[in-house]
Amino acid sequence: MPKQKTHRASAKRFKRTGNGGLKRSNAYTSHRFHGKTKKQRRQLRKASMVSASDMKRIKQMLSQMK
């Protein structure tokens, strides 16, 4: 049986945290900032956590990642 591989695109987008969560960066941060408030832009710089409903799918894609 072939080896199970890590989904490389997902591995570049998510980082594991110390207590088993997954950290991700926010969308809407590359252009069109004139329609966003200063507060929105500041909050989008911070990383977010992956929601519990998506966690199972993403952990499966990253199963071989340490």
UniProtKB/Swiss-Prot annotation:
Residues 1-16, 31-45 have a biased composition (Basic residues). This is Large ribosomal subunit protein bL35. It comes from the Bacteria. One of its GO terms (cellular component) is cytosolic large ribosomal subunit. One of its GO terms (biological process) is translation. One of its GO terms (molecular function) is structural constituent of ribosome. Pfam families: Ribosomal_L35p. Residues 1-52 are annotated as: Disordered. Keywords: Ribonucleoprotein, Ribosomal protein. Belongs to the bacterial ribosomal protein bL35 family.
